[in-house]
From Swiss-Prot:
Down-regulated by light. The gene is PTC52. This is Protochlorophyllide-dependent translocon component 52, chloroplastic. GO terms for cellular component: chloroplast envelope; chloroplast inner membrane; cytosol; plastid. Binds 1 [2Fe-2S] cluster per subunit. It comes from Arabidopsis thaliana (Mouse-ear cress). Residues 1-55 form a transit peptide. The lineage of its organism: Eukaryota, Viridiplantae, Streptophyta, Embryophyta, Tracheophyta. It catalyses: protochlorophyllide a + 4 reduced [2Fe-2S]-[ferredoxin] + 2 O2 + 5 H(+) = protochlorophyllide b + 4 oxidized [2Fe-2S]-[ferredoxin] + 3 H2O.
């Protein structure tokens, strides 16, 4: 999925056939190949590789799938889900004038801007009075968070500052501990709000000793980094493994990137035009075996521990920083550079000029629910993001998410039927293209017993019922309402639709009111044509709004 999502944010490439020579460019900016097109390095102190399919002789002797090989770091310990920072939302999609309700790790949160302290606050989304959600409240004229059920007001420290029903000459009940709201440690890093899921006062200054994952390119001013977010109707583990899987891209997302259809053997060659960052990669020779163009992929995974793992691929490097961050980049993280041989001088020069990363932040919400924040920072073609509004990129990126959404929603239920801890036994994994996915599942099984620790809030073996397809693929409540750019575009385009409808009716009305002697035949025809065009434009715009911001199905059988 990562290659496909990035396709809507990256410039074009060219794919050349050996016989005959031809060129073909994509209609949408796209990656040349999946960012996880991988190569295997032989020397490694830690390796995870999925074994190749058995030979014919071996296949006749056994029907069991080959077991992946792995070497694990000694002294591993269990992953503590409540001793880590979790992202909540990009600040570009939060309105400072209103409180926002979000759920992370099964915890109901209210996120709001405290203008008195000039910072974002993350608090328990529960009023201590009658347990009403504070996210349905407002920020009053004094900058306090007000519960609109009975008017109780709270400051950024969670202290109750006003109980309107308490007599002024009575005891100061608003100062009682029971009147306070739990406040979670929070910080803004990489223009994203993060919170620590423990409101115990001893964690108040946890940021001094434990910080959220640091991603260098998100702090580099030479990189562009437009963000997007969407609520996903399947769970955290399925979301993460899908983003790590390069082999599904040409199939599950077929038709979203228009690849050429060469016959026989062809060369995938990376052009240095159109701001392409991959000029240092070798030319690949592959044989086309089907319409979609799938091919063998390899990967080399290093250092699996409870903090995650990292890997080397053909186009660059990948990191899973547990529990939320998956990063693919042309460069390794600084602390991992010693794990790989230094690139050649020419390669290093190319990388220093054009650098690209794909950042996916996967947030556990509740069983069967997750949230994805994505950004594709790059230091080339920066002007494109300054010209094109963010919502335009989100059109294609949401279509990518929709195209395999139903597959993953159903897959999650089948995994649960067989038991998440039995994933490797239930799935037949004979090729190396699944190495990243296998490694993530091993991390999930080994360090977390194949489940998110919900601390008893949910039954981990129960998932929400599958809704009707139009509700499952809903874009408005899962994305538009949570994206400031798409929400604004939706509002303005709806207004434009109404204007076009009014204009078409008004022009017909003008023709009816004015006498024939007042308006020439040419003018009458012109007004009539304008009215028809205006009405047609309003109907087209209505369809565009619905398909872009509400519901866009994806039928693989007819693509």
């Amino acid at each position: 999925m990562e290659a496909a999502l990035a396709a809507c944010a990256l410039p074009s490439l060219r794919i050349l056939n050996t016989k005959p020579r031809f060129r073909c460019s994509f209609s949408n900016p796209s990656l040349p190949i999946s960012p996880n097109s991988l190569i295997t390095r032989k020397s490694s102190r830690f390796t995870t590789a999925v074994s190749s399919p058995p030979s014919s002789s071996a296949a006749t002797s056994t029907n069991s799938p080959p077991e992946p090989e792995a070497l694990f770091e000694p002294g591993s310990d269990k992953f503590d889900w409540y001793a880590n920072w979790y992202p909540v939302m990009p600040i570009c999609d939060l309105d400072k004038k209103v409180p926002h309700g979000k759920k992370v790790m099964g915890i109901d949160l209210v996120v709001w801007w405290d203008r008195n302290e000039k910072q974002w606050k993350v608090m328990d989304d529960t009023c201590p009075h009658r347990l009403a959600p504070l996210s349905d409240g407002r920020i009053d004229q004094w900058g306090r968070l007000q519960c609109v059920y009975h008017g109780w007001c709270f400051n950024g420290s969670g202290d109750c500052k006003l109980i309107p029903q308490a007599p002024p000459d009575g005891p100061p009940v608003h100062t009682f501990k029971q009147a306070c709201v739990a406040v979670y440690p929070s910080t803004v890093q990489h223009e994203i709000i993060w919170f620590w899921p423990n409101s115990d006062p001893k964690y108040k200054n946890i940021i001094e000793t434990n910080k959220p994952p640091y991603i260098p390119e998100l702090e580099d001013p030479s990189f562009t980094k437009l963000m997007g977010n969407r609520d996903i109707p399947y769970g955290y583990d399925v979301l993460v493994e899908n983003l790590m899987d390069p082999a599904h891209v040409p199939y599950a997302h077929y038709g979203l990137m228009r690849f050429p259809k060469p016959k026989g053997k062809y060369i995938i060659c990376i052009s240095n035009s159109c701001f392409n960052p991959f000029t240092n990669l070798q030319i690949l020779l592959a044989e086309k075996i089907d319409r979609e163009g799938g091919k063998p992929l390899e990967i080399n995974v290093k250092k699996l521990d409870n903090k995650g793992f990292f890997s080397k691929q053909e186009w660059g490097y990948s990191n899973f920083i547990a529990p939320c961050v998956y990063r693919s980049s042309t460069d390794p993280l600084p602390e991992q550079e010693h794990e790989y041989p230094a690139p050649a001088a020419s390669d290093k020069a190319a990388l220093s000029k054009r650098r690209l990363s794909l950042i996916f932040i996967c947030i556990p919400v509740s069983p069967g629910r997750s949230r994805l924040i994505w950004t594709f920072p790059r230091n080339f073609g920066v002007f494109i993001d300054k010209i094109v509004p963010r919502w335009v990129f989100h059109i294609g990126q949401n279509t990518i998410l929709d195209s395999d959404l139903h597959l993953l929603h159903v897959e999650e239920r089948k995994i649960l039927e067989r038991g998440p801890e039995n994933w490797q036994k239930a799935c037949f994994i004979p090729t190396k293209s699944d190495a990243n996915v296998v490694t993530f599942r091993r991390w999930f099984n080994k360090y977390s017993e194949a489940r998110v620790d919900w601390r008893g809030k949910f039954d981990p073996f129960l998932l929400p019922p599958t809704p009707p397809r139009e509700q499952l693929f809903d874009r408005y409540w899962s994305h538009v309402e949570n994206c400031s750019s798409c929400k604004k575009a939706h509002k303005y385009l709806n207004a434009l639709e109404v204007i076009l409808q009014i204009a078409s009716v008004a022009m017909i009305g003008v023709m009816a009111v004015l006498k024939q002697t007042t308006m020439s035949n040419v003018a009458r025809i012109a007004v009539l044509v304008a009215a028809v065009l205006s009405f047609a434009a309003s109907k087209w715009l209505s369809h565009f709004i619905y398909k872009t911001f509400h519901y866009h199905d994806y039928n693989h059988a007819v693509v």
